[in-house]
C-alpha cells in the first residue's frame, strides 16, 4: 500500500516484493520520499543499489523484477538500467569490489601499473573474482571523478587516492 508520498507501508500483497528484505524496502521508501509519487521511476538507481547490497553485491532477475514491481515499472525498464550502469553486477562477485580509474589523468599517473599490480597480487584479471570469493576486480572504470588525486581506486564505494603500489597492498591486506 502506498502512502500519500508514494512510499510503501507494506508489500500490499504483491508476490515479487517479498523478495526484497524489510531493510531494502525501507531503504527504497526513504528514496521514494524524495520524489513526487508520480515519479517513482526516479528511485530506480538507489532501489537497484539497495537490492544489490541485500544480495552480496549482485542482482538477480528475481530481484530486478521485485524492484520493478515495487516501483510500479515494467521489468524491462529496470533491466535496461541494471545492464547499462557499471555499478551493477548481474553475476555473483567477490565480497570486496575494486574499481581502478583508467581515465586519462589516472593513466598518466600510473593506473595501468596499479591494475597490473592488483592482478598479480590477487592472481586474477579484470572482470574476475578471486577463487575464495574475497575480491572482485571490476571492469575498468572510465572515470571516478577524482582526477586531482590520481591514480585512484574505489573499494566497496570508498575512494583511495594518490595511490602507490605499497598503498594498494596496505588497502587490500586490510580487507577481510
Where are the predicted features?
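Signature of N-terminal electron-transfer/Fe-S-associated modules in redox systems
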Residues: 2-176
Amino acid at each position: 500500500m502506498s502512502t500519500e508520498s508514494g512510499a510503501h507501508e507494506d508489500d500490499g500483497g504483491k508476490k515479487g516484493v517479498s523478495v526484497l528484505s524489510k531493510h531494502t524496502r525501507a531503504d527504497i521508501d526513504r528514496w521514494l520520499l524524495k520524489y513526487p509519487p508520480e515519479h517513482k521511476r526516479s528511485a530506480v538507481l538507489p532501489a537497484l543499489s539497495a537490492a544489490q547490497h541485500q544480495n552480496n553485491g549482485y542482482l538477480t532477475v528475481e530481484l530486478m523484477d521485485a524492484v520493478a514491481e515495487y516501483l510500479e515499472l515494467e521489468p524491462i525498464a529496470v533491466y535496461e538500467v541494471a545492464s547499462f550502469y557499471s555499478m551493477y553486477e548481474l553475476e555473483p562477485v567477490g565480497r570486496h569490489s575494486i574499481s581502478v580509474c583508467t581515465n586519462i589523468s589516472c593513466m598518466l599517473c600510473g593506473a595501468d601499473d596499479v591494475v597490473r599490480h592488483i592482478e598479480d597480487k590477487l592472481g586474477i584479471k579484470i572482470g574476475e573474482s578471486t577463487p575464495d570469493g574475497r575480491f572482485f576486480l571490476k571492469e575498468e572504470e572510465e572515470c571516478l571523478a577524482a582526477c586531482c588525486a590520481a591514480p585512484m581506486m574505489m573499494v566497496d564505494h570508498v575512494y583511495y587516492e594518490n595511490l602507490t603500489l605499497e598503498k594498494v597492498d596496505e588497502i587490500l591486506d586490510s580487507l577481510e
